[in-house]
Amino acid sequence: MRSLLFVPADDGKKLDKAMASGADAVIVDLEDSIPAQGKADARMRAAAFIKDAVEAAHRPRLLVRINGFATGLADADLDAVVPARPDAIMLPKAEGGADVIRADAKLSAREAIAGLPDGHIKIVAIATETATALFLAGTYAGASARLEGLTWGAEDLSAELGAQANRDGDGRFLDPYRLARALCLAGAAAARVQAIDTVAVDFRNAAALRRETEEARRDGFTGKMAIHPAQVPVINDVFTPSAAAIAAARAVVAAFDANPGKGTVGIDGVMYDRPHLERARQVLARGTAAGLTL
């Protein structure tokens, strides 16, 4: 998933626009964008929307961000949305693999009741929203086959830390949040799942969004969350491998295929080893996922 677009569950017009935005995934939000008095209504709206949307042809993936376990609202969220068959839930304020295991068990019970195959609904965890979570980023590996991605957030973490800001005057994240970002990336790599970058909140600043997205791709992230449809084309463009990148990756793979058993190969006077091969395969996989013909 290159782009994952947040939409409040109680806003039908925005949900419809999100489906046509070009985003790889739409995150139907039951958490931060929904006030306490609107949670019950938002659950029902989310379930009705997803029930219809999953039948659409060529649709984006459909995720639901539920409320965190500590709120006491997660069970009611899952009761409402699991029968609608979303592709995944987004688990906020996750504190390590134990919370993913807990979510897995809750999903299994509800899938059985709804007549869904066990494991049908995947999990994307937000791995850095509490101070405790930072120390547990390495515990996601092996937690559940449902886990398909880790992402991170700075807003809740900055509130917990008591910080006055999470970005500097140039819009770049300050050190505590750079740490959270790095831990999310490493945790995702250890768990062999997608690493998804956090949102850029200034959705009108396309240049800053492109810079931040290019830095995320450079460092190993595979996608980025969005809060406005206008951000989707930029994110998709950055995370879609260029023709030159595809050609270079194909050359590396072809060179190793032509020299089975070798740990290094030479291409135009440059030496490539096994890590280069792995990166080349990742580029080709991302191209395929983006719909490119390879």
For every predicted segment, state its role.
Residues M1-L294:
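Expand to "…catalyze enediolate/carbanion chemistry for C-C bond making/breaking, isomerization
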